[in-house]
Amino acid sequence: FQDLHAVSDSFDICKFNAFAEGIEEYVLQYNGMTGLDVTEEELLETGDRIYTLERYYNNLAGFDGADDSLPGRFIEGEEAVPGQGASEGQLCELEEMKQEYYARRQWVDGVVPDERLEALGIDIGPGTGVSSGASAPADD
């Protein structure tokens, strides 16, 4: 949903519509507004570029994976999340989840590598990289 929400934010419409309408409606709206003929995949890739660029700017400001966290009660054993049934007392395996998320986004420890920007067609220009030699994970 992040990529779809990035698109809805750029449309300046309520992102909760994505739950009711889905990507198909966004494609119709986009094509109607612009006169273009983009596909669902192209629109989601646009959202991926938006979200990745937002993360890249956060990286430039000094933020990385160490800043992606949750309140202690979700990840520390003494104050497990209250709940009912199967969720009662469960803890979030945050580090594992973060690494899986970063792999899906093709980031390295929360940092957008230059190769990812290039793959998305984002040209930032010379001398602005934040990847510190980080390379995109190899495709499995």
Predicted regions and their residues:
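Extended C-terminal regions of large enzymes
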Residues: F1-D140
